A protein has these predicted regions:
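Active-site-adjacent structural segments surrounding the nucleophilic cysteine of cysteine proteases
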Residues: 9, 13-16, 20-95, 140, ...
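Noncatalytic regulatory segments and standalone regulatory/sensor domains
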Residues: 93, 129, 133, 155-210
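Active-site-adjacent substructure of cysteine-protease-like catalytic cores
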Residues: 113-171
C-alpha cells in the first residue's frame, strides 16, 4: 500500500501513461492520417437525399475503402470500379484492410480533395446536405473491432441513408441507397475509439473537387 501511494511511483505511472498516449497518437497520425475537428450546431435541412444518380456495387472481400471511393468518383461523373481501384489502393495492411490515409491518397490521385474529419452528427448532416457524399469510418458490427468505409447519401430526423457495399449489411432497396440506420445505432457504429486509437471516433471524409 505504501509503495502504491509513493509520490515517485505515482509520478512514474503518470508519465508512463502520458508517454504511451502521446506515442500512440503520433503513430495513429502517421498511419491513419491527421484529424481535423469539425463540430457545428446546425445549419442543415431536417431531411435530405443527394439527388445525383449513382449505382451501388457490392464488394467481394476487404475492398470497402475502394468501393466507397468508386461511389464518390461516380458521383463526380467519373466512371470507377471498386475492384480496379482496390488494386492501386495505398496503405494496405497485411490482412487487406486499408488505413484511412490510403483513402485520402487515392482520392488525391483522382483529383479530389479529401479532408479526414472528426466531428458530430450535425457536421456530418451539413456535409451531406451540401450535395457531396462523405465517407464515414464505422464499425462493421456494434462492439466488434472490424472497421468499414461507407458513403452516406442522405438522412431524415431519425435515420441515416448509406450506399452499402457489403451485401450482408444492406437492409433496403431505395432510390439512391440500400441501407437505413437509426441515429442511435449509427452512433454505436460510429464510435470507433479503441485502446490503440483512442482519439479516432466519429470520423468522416469531407470530399470536394480540387
Amino acid at each position: 500500500m505504501q509503495e502504491i501511494c509513493n509520490p515517485v511511483f505515482i509520478r512514474f505511472l503518470y508519465l508512463t501513461i502520458l508517454y504511451s498516449f502521446i506515442t500512440t497518437t503520433v503513430i495513429n497520425c502517421l498511419l491513419m492520417g491527421l484529424l481535423h475537428p469539425c463540430f457545428v450546431k446546425g445549419g442543415y435541412p431536417p431531411r435530405f437525399l443527394i439527388p445525383h444518380p449513382n449505382r451501388i456495387d457490392l464488394q467481394q472481400s476487404m475492398e470497402c475503402s475502394a468501393y466507397a471511393c468508386a461511389f464518390v468518383l461516380r458521383h463526380y461523373g467519373r466512371e470507377a470500379s471498386g475492384q480496379a481501384l482496390y488494386r492501386e489502393m495505398p496503405c494496405k495492411r497485411r490482412n487487406g484492410s486499408v488505413y484511412p490515409r490510403g483513402v485520402k491518397k487515392l482520392l488525391a490521385r483522382q483529383g479530389l480533395n479529401a479532408v479526414y474529419c472528426t466531428g458530430n452528427l450535425n457536421a456530418l448532416k451539413r456535409e451531406i446536405s451540401s450535395g457531396n457524399p462523405p465517407i464515414v469510418f464505422i464499425r462493421t458490427y456494434p462492439g466488434k473491432n472490424w472497421l468499414h468505409f461507407v458513403p452516406v447519401v442522405g438522412y431524415d430526423e431519425k435515420h441515416l441513408f448509406l450506399a452499402e457495399s457489403l451485401a450482408d449489411l444492406a437492409n433496403c432497396s431505395e432510390n439512391g441507397y440500400n441501407r437505413k440506420v437509426s441515429n442511435k445505432d449509427f452512433f454505436k457504429l460510429w464510435n470507433t475509439s479503441m485502446l490503440k486509437m483512442p482519439l479516432y471516433r466519429h470520423t468522416f471524409f469531407r470530399i470536394s473537387a480540387v
